[in-house]
């Protein structure tokens, strides 16, 4: 509708040469803004340490910025400080996903949600969490935020793979992991994107601007003399869809590859290096090499390592170990790191 309205206004108020100029300008501005929003898929690392308090790392917490909508994955203590340090807008946070009920992954919820109340948030906030977690935190919030400025909703997640969230842009699936308590991973997956307009071709065939959205959805164009111009003549292929798999605390668990197939990016915990493989198995954690092996099994293109044990003063050994078992790109999580997942 907006395209059609712009087209009508331009025809009524501008001469032909002016019309051509403004026509091209409006197309450029609208297309650039839409492309910018469509492409945004950023990962912000707020915390990548393990359970033991450390001066080097904060507890687990990540934020995905998908088309200017924020999704938090796990919420370690002082998550609101990470928000402030990375200049993220709290009012854009509408969903929080909690993988399991160990404190380093969920004890940040009370502080974060109280901060949102202090900021006079009004829109509802959904916490995706298992039934036990919903029971525990509902009691807490009913006491401390009974007269809060916004509504807190709980979406209960089970132990089987399932789609737990969907909007126009993405789906979010949960899948089981292997830890000492029930633990879920999360798979964020973009829906198919729109095709790109070929500016020179739509001008050549004089396609009205209000039909551009139809073209981006795959429609052909019929000229006034009833000639059908195939869509592929007027548009080019859409960008590839991005997917991000988050594997929270878990022992080595090859069945992850049954749920996660060929993700663009995978985050996998790597609490230890090979030296402490036995300890990792005992505590339900993974080594960097095991994380890399899971990434290989899933067919991932890129691997991010995190959840580092306090005993290490450097994580370079994690990266070296993972690169021996994974052919793709390996990155180390670190507080303050922002990754453009489209690249």
What is each of the regions a protein language model found here?
Residues 38-86, 122-124, 186-188, 237-247, ...:
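Conserved beta-strand hairpin/beta-sheet module of binuclear metal-dependent hydrolase folds
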Residues 73-76, 93-101, 130, 244-250, ...:
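Active-site neighborhood of phospho(di)ester-bond hydrolases with catalytic His/Asp-centered motifs
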Residues 77-128, 155-158:
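Active-site metal-binding motif and surrounding structural segment of the metallo-beta-lactamase
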Residues 121-125, 130-158:
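Active-site neighborhood of divalent metal-dependent phosphoester bond hydrolases
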Residues 157-305, 316-326, 342-343:
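Metal-dependent phosphodiesterase/nuclease catalytic metal-binding core
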Residues 3, 7-10, 15-72, 199, ...:
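Zn-dependent metallo-beta-lactamase
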